Amino acid sequence: MDKLSTLAAANQQRAQEVIRDSGIESIWRSVGAEPHLVGSLRTGLLMTHRDIDFHIYSSPLRVADSFAAMARLAENSRIRRIEYGNLLDTNEECLEWHAWYADADDQLWQIDMIHMPKGSAYDGYFERVADRIAAVLTDQTRETILRLKYETPETEKIMGIEYYQAVLRDGVRTYAEFEAWRLSLIHI
């Protein structure tokens, strides 16, 4: 296992520890919701950006239940901050939560939780996308994506899907190519 794969595996293990130690999945289940892991942790492509993404489904979605879950999460002394957004009256039809959790090494992990009605337009969509990405990865494309993520400056905010499209769809292999690829999207 090379250096990048080792680092990615360690961070993915830490992310799983955050999920377990925070009790986040059981907290959401306690209010009748179904938490589903999405994003880079689900694809196995979590690198240095400490971010854990969940889509959470309820039928019906009740704002009070969402707040009850977050109140329970906030009781954990490792939770440092929580943000909330109500997007129920938008196309996204969701409640958006962001929590920051300090792990055993006092490293902050951002936990993004999108709470939406079961059966909504996005129900299962991002889970299927993540599973398709994971299914088409080769050793080479996995290593390329991890390297690009590793080489990205911490100040640069790039969505994971950008790396995946660049590498898997468009054949990008280096960070210089990735930067050019991103610039080309602006000029389309």
Model-identified regions with their sequence ranges:
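Conserved small/polar residues in nucleotide/adenosyl-binding loops
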Residues: 186-188
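Helical scaffold of the NTase/Pol beta-like nucleotidyltransferase catalytic core
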Residues: 1-38
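Acidic, metal-coordinating catalytic segment for phosphate/diphosphate chemistry
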Residues: 124-130, 136-178
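Hydrophobic N-terminal alpha-helices or hydrophobic patches in metabolic proteins across all domains
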Residues: 38, 123-124
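Short amphipathic alpha-helices in soluble, non-transmembrane regions
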Residues: 66-74
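Conserved catalytic core of two-metal-ion nucleotidyltransferases
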Residues: 77-117
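Active-site nucleotide-donor binding segment shared across nucleotidyl transfer reactions
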Residues: 24-67
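Short, charged/polar surface micro-motifs in flexible loops or helix N-caps
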Residues: 60-64, 106-107, 118-121
